[in-house]
A protein has these predicted regions:
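N-terminal secretory signal peptides and thylakoid transit peptides that target proteins
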Residues: 1-19
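FMN-binding flavodoxin-like domain, especially the glycine-rich phosphate-binding loop
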Residues: 2-7, 35-41, 45-77, 84-197
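C-terminal segment of classical bacterial N-terminal signal peptides
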Residues: 22-27
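Boundary at the C-terminal end of the N-terminal hydrophobic targeting segment
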Residues: 28-32
Length: 197
């Protein structure tokens, strides 16, 4: 009879574990969960595809949701034309309107914010997101693709645009290296506490 009881208890504990409940040995009571899983979103704008590649690395590693920002008026493909437009937008404080509804960000605790480096900071669509979305109390962590400027002023601009949000350490990756950057992205996510150590 004792053998049957122990076996039955083990089966019940295994089934309960599969159902998502952890049990304290010998008690049959659920163990308290120490930390609720944080809901994570990657919000990004990608002009050439480099930032999108990093966003997809993050999604593959974490299973998080993606929000690809789309300006109402797409940017020109020509590099020099985009650089000129980005400079004007930054100087004038212009925030390009987005096609995306932004109210869904309220469901998330941690938002990783990705952008190409334009004039040493976030691209216009990302500045629009940071300036208009309800981000108070969220944890915001930037990642930037670049060709030599690194993070630039993006971390400082993030704190300026979202003073009531918490911010984490950013990641800068050269655009020419994004395809092979998965391990670097994984290390960054672990350091930020977004993946198990």
């Amino acid at each position: 009879m004792e053998k049957y009881s122990n076996g039955r208890r083990q089966i019940l504990m295994a089934l309960a574990s599969l159902a998502g409940g952890l049990f304290l040995p010998g008690t049959g009571r659920a163990a308290p969960q120490t930390q609720e899983a944080q809901r994570m979103l990657v919000v990004f704008y990608s002009h050439t595809g480099n930032t999108r590649t990093i966003a997809r690395h993050i999604q593959a590693l974490t299973g998080c949701d993606l929000l690809d920002l789309e300006p109402v008026t797409p940017y020109p493909r020509d590099y020099d034309t985009v650089v000129s437009q980005a400079k004007k937008e930054k100087q004038q404080g212009f925030l390009p309107p987005l096609k995306n509804p932004l109210d869904m960000v309220s469901r998330y605790d941690v938002i990783l914010v990705g952008s190409p480096s334009w004039c040493g900071t976030f691209a216009g669509p990302v500045r629009t997101f940071l300036s208009t979305a309800a981000l108070d109390g969220k944890t915001l962590i930037p990642f930037i693709t670049h060709e030599g400027s690194g993070l630039g002023s993006a971390p400082a601009d993030l704190r300026r645009l979202c003073p009531s949000a918490k911010t984490g350490e950013g990641l800068a990756i050269r655009g020419s290296r994004v395809d092979g950057a998965r391990q670097q992205v994984e290390s960054w996510l672990r350091k930020a506490g977004l993946l198990p150590a």
